[in-house]
Structures are given as C-alpha cells and as structure tokens.
A protein has these predicted regions:
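Glycine-rich loop(s) and the adjacent beta-strand/alpha-helix scaffold that form part
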Residues: 3-29, 198, 207, 211-214, ...
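FAD cofactor-binding and catalytic pocket of flavoenzymes
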Residues: 53-60, 65-68, 78, 83, ...
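N-terminal FAD cofactor-binding segment of flavoenzymes
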Residues: 7-9, 16-79, 110, 140, ...
Length: 498
C-alpha cells in the first residue's frame, strides 16, 4: 500500500484483526500470544508432527494490523541464484512438484536492495551489526571449532543504532511479542503509517474478508468483508491484492467460488491451495555447566550459512541455515518436547539458565498433496468452512532434518555441551506456496508479477506466491516481491491495462 500511495494510487487496507500498536504489546510470552496470534479455528491432517502436537494450531501467525511482520524475529538472508531454479538444479524428485520460478535472482537483486534499505538490514548497505549476546557467543564458538566459516550476527531487520525513524534495540528479548521499542522493522511501524500519511490510504481493522467478487468478464470488482459485529460490507476495487498468509489467502479464493469459477476463484489449474510449504525446521537446545542466559538480547542473534549451499553428497538436495533462538521458560516448557513430563523434562527445565538454543530452517520440497482445503466439518464463528492444512514431510525433508540435528549436536558438543535435545518443529511461521507463481498457467495460480493467470486484476502479495521455498527466511523476499509488484501495478494502472 505504501508503494502504491507513493505513486498516487488510493488504497483501502482490510485487516481481519484489531489495530494493536507497539504501546499495546506486553513482554509476556503467553499473554502476547493470546493478544496477537491468529486463533480462529483451523484443522490439520497428514503425518507431520505439528498435526499431532498442535492439531488446532498448524501455524503461528498474527491477526492484527501489521500481520506476522510484528511477530517475526527479523532474519533477512536472500535467496541464492540456484534456489530460483529448483527444478533445473535438483532435477525431478519422486513425490516433489518442483518448478523453476518465472523470475531470476538477477531480476530480483534491485528489489532486494530496496527491501534491505527499507527494513534496515544489518550487515547490508552500511548498516552496523547487532551486538553478540551469550547465545550467539556459544553458537559462534561451536561454529569455529567444527570448521564453519560463514557465521555472523545477522543480517537482521532490527536496528543496532537509530535508523529511518526507529531507535536502536534495547536488547530486551521480546521480538516475537511485537517489539514495544519499534527497533524491529514491521509494516505496522513503517509502511502502514506512511501510507496513511499520504492521505491516500484508509485502514479498516476488524474487517474480515470473506469473498472476492467479479464482474461478467471475470475481473475482480469488490471484496465482501465482515466487521467485528458480523455486518457484511462491500468494498469496490479496480485491483484486489490478497495478503492473508499462505493459509488464509487460498482459503479466501476457495470461498470465492462462483458459477464462472466453480472450483474457486483463479483456480482453473486446480492448483489453488496446493504446494503448501512451511520450511524444514527443528530446534536444538544444549545444556552447559555454566550459565548462558540465552534469553538476554535478541530472540534471534546469529546465523550460520555453511550448510545452506546445495550439496547432494549429504544425502538431500537444497540446504539449511542454523540460527540462534531463545525461548523464555514458559514457551520452552510448551515447545521443547510437546507433551513431555518426568525426569528428562524437568532436567531440561532446571537447566534453563545454562541452556543455549538454535533453530534449523531449510528448504522443504513442494508436494501437490501438501495443500490448503476447506474443511468439510469445521466452521468459523461466521459459519464459513475453516482451512484444513494437510502436510507430510517429503523423504528429502526427513534426510535434511536428521543431518541437521547431527550437525547441531556436533556444534554444541564442540563448545562443551553436557547434554542436547532435538526439539520437533513448532507451529509454522514460514508459510509459503499454496498460490505459486508459474510460467505456464497449468502449473500454478499466478504469473511472474503475482497476478492470477485467470483474473487479470487479482494479485497475491504474500508468501503464497513462492514457487519453491529456498532456505532463507522468507520476509525479505516477500517484501522485495511486493515492491516489484506494486511498481508493476502502478505502471499498469497508469497505462490503462488494469
């Protein structure tokens, strides 16, 4: 919206959740979760561990103005060139629906530059690094001892010094809880206020989109939404951009089925909801003889990139990053081993002060069967079918996770750990695919601009567009794609093509 309003195009922003501000946030893990998280009903299916541990919470995303940018930890690595060419690089894998992106790194580089400058990514464009906290120092010590070469305290979109109207981080460790200090970039802090200041953007919070309508030619013409009291409203539009995350965006298109689009809006390919990805993830926590105090400083404070390059000799395609992660005691108790109790569990919790932690995040394989559908049995408070999230790990994912756990254990043991624990994946924060871009309409939902193949004025502006997931945390790429898309929309509107 900010990019469009800068180009003189009026916008209406519909947000399903409330308009929380940074002053509203609380530095308490569970209270903040209840305040920010998307807790509307959802269903799960498939063999993934999350469906067993958190069947009603397949994803950890935010329902409030600013969306999940208010929750993210701030890591901003870029995709590598080969990750835009997954099918060409990896070849055909049984059970995987790999596809090359319809765009290249060369095309994306100027937009990555713009996104990094907007976010204030550390280690980029002269931005200084964040200080190393104890969790990172343990992490880096182990990295050096096992021979890794590419590790640093970023890049992150949290300020080490004042930048772009945002202060320096006070290192309070509550990035996941919204960041009261505004040192972390989010659309709540930067883009939305600036769009509103242009006088061309109207924000409507508590406005839950339930259907996109179209005219007789098949062009999108309006969005129907419900306010907090359940009253139905219609907002007419020349262009509709959907950014509801990779679960709610396909759900909205499926809910928008009509006689012209009986299987869901923009779904002539049958690909709406398919190829949902959530990154290959897992965590490693290690106990040491002396205190670490991992919770002091940023929630995430460092990245190791040595395992990111594609190297099939490891037994899998693609790669992964290691990233420091610190959960507070209440979150660690819930997520370190869901459902655990007894001596081993209490030993882990008793050692909290002496614990270091990291998150493993890598490229998972797209699969047609990993998909978002409308539930046959569960409805939301408005009486509409909730999203069902079906997911199964691909064999490549299993091999990568096993290998990554072994490498993480080796790193911490090299740093002197006296015990380690392999923590299973959390509810998904990197929700990708499900409305993927494709060169050919039969292979996906969107073209190279994130515009629906079937509906010339319907765009998707979130992680749903990703053709494959890469290993990098996705926010930087999502922002870069959104800037590029807004530029295209503005030019097309001015030329009378939309």
């Amino acid at each position: 919206a900010y990019e469009l309003t800068k180009a003189g195009i009026p916008c209406v922003l519909l947000e399903a959740g409330p308009h929380l501000t940074n002053e509203d946030y609380v530095n308490d893990e569970w209270e903040a979760f209840g305040q920010m998280a998307w807790l509307d009903g959802r269903a799960t299916s498939g063999s993934w561990r999350v469906a067993k541990d958190f069947p009603d919470l397949p994803a950890w995303i935010v329902k409030a103005v600013g969306g999940t940018t208010t929750h993210w930890a701030g890591a901003t690595p870029r995709f590598k060139d080969y990750e835009f060419k997954a099918l060409s690089t990896y070849g055909k894998l049984e059970g995987a629906s790999l596809l090359d992106w319809p765009i290249s790194l060369e095309e994306m580089e100027p937009y990555y530059d713009k996104a990094e400058k907007a976010l204030g990514s550390t280690h980029r464009h002269g931005r200084p690094p964040l200080p190393a906290n104890n969790n990172y120092k343990v992490f880096a010590n182990g990295a050096e001892r096992v021979g890794y070469k590419f590790y640093a305290t970023g890049p992150y979109a949290t300020n080490a010094e004042p930048y772009d109207g945002r202060p320096a981080s006070v290192q309070d460790g509550f990035n996941f809880q919204g960041d009261k200090q505004k040192s972390k970039w989010s659309t709540l802090v930067r883009e939305i206020p600036r769009a509103i200041e242009t006088g061309l953007c109207e924000l409507r919070a508590d406005s839950h989109a339930v259907q996109i309508t179209h005219d007789s030619s098949g062009k999108a013409d309006a969005v129907l939404y419900l306010d907090a009291e359940g009253n139905l409203h219609r907002q007419a539009a020349k262009v509709v951009c959907v950014a509801g995350n990779s679960i709610e965006s396909p759900r909205l298109l499926l809910l928008s089925a009509s006689s012209m689009f009986p299987d869901g809006l923009a779904n002539s390919s049958g690909e709406v909801g398919c190829n949902y990805m959530r990154h290959l993830t897992g965590s490693m926590y290690a106990r040491f003889e002396k205190p670490v105090h991992m919770y002091r400083g940023e929630t995430m404070a460092g990245i190791i990139a040595d395992e990111q390059p594609h190297n099939p000799s490891r037994g899998f395609v693609g790669g992964y990053y290691m990233e420091t992660l610190a959960l507070g005691p209440s979150f660690l108790a819930s997520f370190v081993e869901p459902g655990a109790w007894g001596e081993d569990f209490t030993e882990m919790m008793d050692a909290y002060a002496n614990t270091a932690g990291m998150w493993i995040v890598g490229e998972d394989m797209p699969q047609t069967s990993n998909r978002i559908t409308l539930s046959d049995s569960s409805k939301d408070k408005w009486g509409l079918p909730v999203a069902n999230v079906n997911y199964d790990d691909h064999a490549n994912d299993v091999s990568m996770r096993t290998y990554a756990y072994e490498k993480a254990e080796a790193l911490y043991k090299a740093a002197g750990a006296i015990g380690t624990h392999r923590t299973p994946p959390y509810p998904s924060t990197h929700n990708l695919g499900s409305l993927r871009m494709s060169e050919l309409p039969k292979d996906g939902v969107l073209n190279r601009w994130g515009c629906a193949h079937d509906v010339k004025n319907l765009f998707v502006s979130d992680g749903s567009v990703m053709t494959t997931g890469g290993a990098a945390n996705p926010t930087l790429t999502i922002v870069a794609l959104a800037i590029r898309q807004a530029e295209y929309i503005a030019k097309s509107l001015n030329a009378g093509d939309l």
